[in-house]
């Protein structure tokens, strides 16, 4: 179930201020954030946002197709290394 339209999308205040400041100065630089729950807004398009995945900051370049999604969707938190491989030597 989505968020109520009367509430509007959630975006962390500090992140919104940083992006508006960069847009006013027409600058593009990487913005570090821990706010994975923030919704991507149209004013974020074209910026690179480094989203924390619990271990490091993953750079995410925002494009038009990402608008409406959350930042955390583009920074995976788990590394899948595949299921256990069958060891032929152990079977002997």
From Swiss-Prot:
One of its GO terms (cellular component) is cytoplasm. Keywords: Ribonucleoprotein, Ribosomal protein, RNA-binding, rRNA-binding. InterPro entries: Ribosomal_uS19 (IPR002222), Ribosomal_uS19_bac-type (IPR005732), Ribosomal_uS19_CS (IPR020934), Ribosomal_uS19_SF (IPR023575). GO terms for molecular function: rRNA binding; structural constituent of ribosome. It holds the Pfam family Ribosomal_S19. It comes from the Bacteria. PROSITE patterns: RIBOSOMAL_S19 (PS00323). One of its GO terms (biological process) is translation. Protein S19 forms a complex with S13 that binds strongly to the 16S ribosomal RNA. Belongs to the universal ribosomal protein uS19 family. This is Small ribosomal subunit protein uS19. The lineage of its organism: Bacteria, Bacillati, Cyanobacteriota, Cyanophyceae, Nostocales.
């Amino acid at each position: 179930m989505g968020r109520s339209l009367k509430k509007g999308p959630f975006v962390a205040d500090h992140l919104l201020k940083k992006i508006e400041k960069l847009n006013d100065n027409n600058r593009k630089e990487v913005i570090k954030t821990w706010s994975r729950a923030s919704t991507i807004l149209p004013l974020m398009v074209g910026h690179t946002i480094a989203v924390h995945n619990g271990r490091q900051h993953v750079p995410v370049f925002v494009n038009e197709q990402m608008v409406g999604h959350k930042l955390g969707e583009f920074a995976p938190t788990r590394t899948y290394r595949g299921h256990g491989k069958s060891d032929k030597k152990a079977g002997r």
